[in-house]
Structures are given as structure tokens and as C-alpha cells.
């Protein structure tokens, strides 16, 4: 299950944003109780791919790389 601040990669190219499969990003918003996610993806230089912030991704489009740390 994906959650806020998880590190993910994109499974397939996203022609709308220019992000390629394997591009790494961070989940910055969880929508509809986990039905969709806003992800901040980064290019090779570490810059935000801004168009990704206006795109909703489903869990089927994302692969979790690292689970967000939780503070107790």
C-alpha cells in the first residue's frame, strides 16, 4: 500500500509530463483514500518535473522503492 512521502518510480513513460519509466519521485498527496496520488517526480539533474504535480497517478502506475519513515 502506498502512502504519503513514499519514494516511488514510474512503471511506464508518461508522455503528458515527459517523465520516463524508472523516474523517481515522492508521493506528496494521497487522493480519494488511496485511489490516486500526486507525485513529485525529478529529472536527471534533480529538478522537479512540474507537470507531474498536476497529474493524478494510480498505484498501478507506480512502484514503491522506499517506505516513508514514520515518527513516533
Model regions and ranges:
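Basic/aromatic-rich interaction segments and small domains that mediate binding to polyanionic partners
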Residues: 3-63, 70-71
